[in-house]
Design a protein with these regions (language model features):
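An internal, acidic/charged active-site-proximal segment
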Residues: 139-211
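Short, glycine/acidic-rich beta->alpha junctions
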Residues: 32, 64, 113, 178-181, ...
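Short, conserved acidic/polar surface loops in the N-terminal third of protein domains
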Residues: 93-100, 132-135, 148, 186-187, ...
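Gly/serine-rich nucleotide phosphate-binding loop at the start of the catalytic core
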Residues: 1-53, 63
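Short, charged/polar micro-motifs that form catalytic or ligand-binding hotspots
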Residues: 26-30, 41, 107-108, 175-179
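Electropositive, glycine- and tryptophan-enriched low-complexity nucleic-acid-binding patches
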Residues: 39, 49-53, 107-170
Length: 211
């Protein structure tokens, strides 16, 4: 059984994007070597510009991923107990023409380097060690947009806005590393009614003002 049309229908994906994704996703798995608009065109028969036009628009990946998780829960394939995890991933990239290129922290090298950064929020099951990415955004460099913390907060708010009730019931805990241990993150998690598990910096101020 092909589950993709079912997911596209449940996620209420618009017809033009549904038609595109029905072709794109099986093709993505079948193409050998480098993946780009030209290789998609070569193996599909569609014009290269068609792929570029669709990729310039926002595709509903988060809706598909979350719909898949809800479908697995409904089918009792996984236990509906999750934690939210959030982290950023660095991608080395040289050149000057790539969109979003900037200086980002590379934890493997222990320093900032030129490249790209993707911020990911995922659902991780308590049992079975399954992980489902549900929101991925490219972090913009400082010269283009606000600082990284503001972008991370915007991403988290955008996820909670349409799915607040479901996430609060099935994923009441957010886990992130020390770079997210800032007051705005604690305030947001408190406002959403979820617990925030993180690692504080060595110079964190834990003093409670006397009232």
């Amino acid at each position: 059984m092909n589950i993709l049309p079912v997911l596209l229908s449940l996620a209420a994906v618009p017809a033009h994007q549904s038609h595109f994704l029905n072709l794109l996703l099986p093709l993505w798995l079948a193409i050998p070597g480098r993946i780009n608009a030209r290789s998609f065109s070569r193996y599909s028969g569609w014009n290269e510009r068609t792929f570029r036009r669709h990729f310039q628009a926002a595709l509903p990946w988060h809706a598909l991923h979350l719909t898949l998780v809800k479908l697995l829960v409904r089918c009792k394939a996984i236990v509906p107990r999750f934690i939210l995890v959030m982290d950023a991933s660095f991608i080395p990239k040289s050149g000057t023409k790539t969109s979003g290129l900037g200086a980002f922290w590379n934890s493997c090298a222990g320093r900032s380097e030129t490249g790209l950064e993707l911020s990911c929020i995922a659902l991780m099951t308590w049992f079975g060690h399954h992980c489902f990415p549900i929101s991925i955004r490219q972090t913009r460099p400082k010269k283009e947009k606000a600082d990284r913390l503001t972008q991370y907060l915007d991403q988290l708010r955008a996820l909670f806005r349409p799915h607040r009730a479901w996430l609060k019931e099935f994923a009441p805990i957010l886990v992130a590393d020390g770079q997210y241990a800032k007051k705005p993150f604690f305030d947001l998690c408190r406002a959403e009614g979820i617990a925030f598990v993180t690692k504080l910096a060595v110079n964190a101020n834990l003093l409670i003002p006397f009232v």
